[in-house]
């Protein structure tokens, strides 16, 4: 400003009623008494020093600002303060900034004395009737603030909202906003803070009304209190939108209160591009650190910047006025009617001021209201505050391209969502080492993997936490909801990701995405599976008692068969009737060993070489064969069932069977969708089931699926639950089975608060995961791998060693016993042969063992040692004739031995002395028995050949002096024939 112009300011009028303007004096009324306050004192000092430093004038013409403190907002104290200001001869009064009632009193007194009043606070309401001499206001008018809020609501398409008022006159201040809701017929609920200044009840009402847009009309301190309480109630999530009318929004410290995903909008008038703005902020910061080290400096308050601009505006107006006339000051008093004669002129010049200050462009209309200014729209972000748009005083709203939008992909990107869930296998489970982990890493499961896929697809972050009461959600008698539904309604969570069933009743209070899994209600019950198959499972078809009785029956049949064969004369017969020499020798094939072996062959269905002859033995055999036929058939039929399919005994087969009986209890999860299904069902069977479950004591409802499974396994209890969880638990426990089919059809979805802007985007993401088969892959990951096979797989399964390994053990044991018996027989036979042949046992054993292990020899000669004493008598013809037949081969009964003792079978030996040794036997008669055995035919053929020479070694006298010949082997058929 030119020095010559300011020199005019210090020239006093010659009028006798005015004093010479020795200095440009102003009065500032401050209603903030704290040193660490809004910085208004410092702002006034900065403005004064800046003006006085630029203008080189004498000290008596310098700008002076007298500060008066207002202790409380009262008309009496304000009037008293004004009475102290008037005698000082001020050209203008500034403030107060935060006391509309006091500001109204100051305006009234200044109007009476015609002293310009510069308002730096909100406009009083109701506005005083327009006077001839009025004040000017640097603060935005109520109409402008109301219009700005209304335009923001329309821009973001917020149909309904709730207004929290700190004072009753807020409806008048926001008259344009209320009028806009009335015209659009949208809902605007208004709630007033009481004298306690506790916003908690109001916030709870808003939460219960499911309103997501909240407008707060209060100063900075009360707005901060409301947001802090909202954070405690979980109402600062991404689903809530806050719009604050205070112009001190930039200095609100919200980082420790709200979340990163919160949507909080406010206004700012600061012109950050002003050349003096950095110096202004730095000076306030330095002053704050010198005087207020205990608290954090949050930034400059709007009232401080308005005080700074007010000083410059008054100086500019006085400068313009001084160009046209000389002005002077006049001391005034409250008790006199005198006025300042230059006040009206200065007021007119004030309305014509155009100034670019710290709060932007400063201009006034004819009513003294600020015009041609802008309001910066800020959004709270992780980096502080982000400008998302500008509102112009000509009622124009310009939003930036990076602003919030209803486009879901933009709102979800880089957001941190609170996700509530509940522990339910296999959807959400704790990891085995969850205590050593933190955050989302503590959990695993199908829903956890699906949420991770969604977060990667939509680029948002999330924080998993368990629902406080451990319930899915059901309505209470008072209208509230429990569980995850209640947390979504109360906006404590942004999403609910779990085995969350979509129901019509829940859809009324919350939103759901499209189902990510389709299922239905099923019945889970336990079955008796019997013991686990073992190596001796082939014994399972019969009980131990049956096996015992079968053994006793076998022994009884063997004994009866032995006795019947011994008693019946038809079982005694001559085995070789063609040998006429001893016709009275009879045999019985049913020895004790054969009697024990014959039932075994029949039982094993392999037969035996022993055939019954008598009617009694045939009767015993037939009865035993009939017995074994039934036993073997029954065993074969039961063996397949026992080794391939375990027995399952289920007393009920459907929901109707379950409802018609009372022996088996049944229930659902408490406060779950299944319980709600039966509660609201109109089907008669389900109504009866609900009446039973509701009236049954003790309660049949359980708190979790694990508790229901344990109750099923430990008692007669049927559990009603979703089919997917039914399938999962059946795979883990083979003693569980599903009864009947599905009772209904429904789906699992992701829950969100009502009106959530994320619904469409999450639904599209779920559909994309289904199309990519990602959800099916996740299901196979968490459902497969159980201990029990699928019940739908009816293909025949091969039997393993655990089923039939016992029969191999029996076979091995039988082979070991057979080898042991063979060894014992070998030792016993070798020992007897050694005694008869008069050789050592070891020599005989080695000789016999050499023949036994020879692979090429299939026959051998019976070795006989020639005795060292007198020569034995030659084998007589009678001995040859008494040779017995066994299995179609001829064996010698031994020289000098008894024929009856030579063969192993029982026989009847009648005393039949043979013919004299010298007599020639008579010619044999042909064999006349009905059935001629093979050996008889061979003997007849030998006789018919007519060979009369005696065989070698037969008929030679014992006294012969010829050298001894080697021991002959067994006599062949031809030798026998020649001997005869």
UniProtKB/Swiss-Prot annotation:
Entry keywords, A to Z: Cell membrane, Cell projection, Disulfide bond, Glycoprotein, Ion channel, Ion transport, Ligand-gated ion channel, Membrane, Postsynaptic cell membrane, Receptor, Signal, Synapse, Transmembrane, Transmembrane helix, Transport
Membrane side Cytoplasmic: residue ranges: 566-622, 825-980
Cystine residue pairs: 36-292, 83-334, 165-170
Compositionally biased intervals (Gly residues): 894-903
Transmembrane intervals: 545-565, 623-643, 804-824
Subunit details: Homotetramer. Heterotetramer with GRIK2. Can form functional heteromeric receptors with GRIK1 and GRIK2. Can form functional heteromeric receptors with GRIK3.
Protein task: Ionotropic glutamate receptor that functions as a cation-permeable ligand-gated ion channel, gated by L-glutamate and the glutamatergic agonist kainic acid. Cannot form functional channels on its own and produces channel activity only in heteromeric assembly with GRIK1 and GRIK2 subunits. Can form functional heteromeric receptors with GRIK3.
Name this polypeptide is given: Glutamate receptor ionotropic, kainate 5
